[in-house]
Amino acid sequence: VMDGITALPRIHAAAPFARIVMASTLTHQGAAVTIRALSLGAADYIAKPDAGQIAGAEDYRRDLLVKIRGLGSSAKRTAYALAPRRLGQPLTATTAAPRKDLALGNKTLKAKPEALFIGSSTGGPAALGAVVASLVGKATVPVFITQHMPAMFTAILAEHMAKATGAKVVEAKDGMAAEAGSFYIAPGDFHMTVQRRAGRVFIVLDQSPPENFCRPAVDPLFRSAAAVYGERAFGVVLTGMGHDGREGARVLASKGGLILVQDEASSVVWGMPGAVATAGLACAIKPISEIGPTILNVLRGVNP
């Protein structure tokens, strides 16, 4: 009998544009299998309801329909966006032409960035793995990541990403001091923000209400980035469903910070990056293969 992990690469080999949703139990083992499936090209995942829970089954049905509709409505991508790969494996360039009908926001650095803030959702683990792999040993600032995931999954994601890339990737903890070159992933069910105290920047976790139906959400992270770092904050929005990150990006842009977004062709779902781009807040729109190099250039003080 073939399990899902074995089947994933074979499905993508036969149908490169297939969107696969992984059904997972909310356990440590289930989280580990799900992260592996996402790194192999699964587009998204959904938590299985507990046996005998009618309310849970109804939530499962609703969430599954939302994911299917979101993935199905996205334009057909190149096989590049979904091809099986190890977490942290570099990505090759897409051949799709960039959108020319979108107005870009501020493209001029006012100050060299002192911190990097990344938001992602559907398709995010594979995209994050590629970006982190390109930054490890080269990024000279702390990197804060909000990926839409439940508790336990984010810890497993941090572990897998650290092993795959060799980077210092950790699940963030409340009160943790930010260190240059380290990557902090917001824990599931907590918003992650930053705060400056006595000249140092610390991570703050809270369970205030979900934003954009998400906790953790990207908007509060970006708002805190604007408040703490201002024009020295650099935001990035990767593939994801919905529009989380757009309003936070608006606040960040108003303070002079730049926001880079992933392009439509290389995104599994161009919801979050598309929302920022169509709002005219993006400094540049790049395929995932160019996100890492662009980030490094901006961190060196080069305009995107």
Language-model region placement:
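Conserved acid/base catalytic micro-environments in cytosolic active-site loops
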Residues: 1-304
